[in-house]
Amino acid sequence: MSTSPGARDVTIPRDVEEARRAIHDVVAQQPFARLMGYKVVDAADLAVTLSLPLGLHLMQPHVVHGGAMYSLADAASTFAVLTRLWPEFWATTVEQSIQFLRPVTAQRGEIVAFAHVRRFGKTISFVEATVTFEGREVATARSTQMRQPRPR
């Protein structure tokens, strides 16, 4: 439910184009997402796919740093919730766990995270994410996201 009269009801699903616009807006306004170089591959209501181009800056020493994969999964998970909440609210990660399934040793290409909301709640949402490289799963993550007032 929205908190102010006349505001959009965030419990109502968005169409695909609205969700895509919301996430492109979020990425454009988030300095960390720009610094990391996240690219929006796709977005729909309560689901987001992001990519992260690989490079030497993400390597430690011969594999992609786990923190890069963790961060990508976290961003995709938060953004999946924001497809429904933005611009009225923000979401923050309360908890995230990740399982690294195999190393990524390439210095070129991209890792891709697909996140979808398993349960969208009034305050708390539960999200699952999969990180892939060249179509193979390299990590899976689960997170808990909390709806927050949007910073002004």
Identify the function of each model-found stretch.
Residues 80-111, 117:
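Hydrophobic beta-strand-centered segment that forms part of the acyl-chain substrate-binding groove
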Residues 2-7, 11-14, 87, 105-110, ...:
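HotDog/MaoC-like acyl-thioester-processing domains
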Residues 53-78:
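Hot-dog-fold acyl-thioester-processing enzymes
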Residues 65, 113-114:
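Short, glycine/charged-enriched secondary-structure capping and boundary segments
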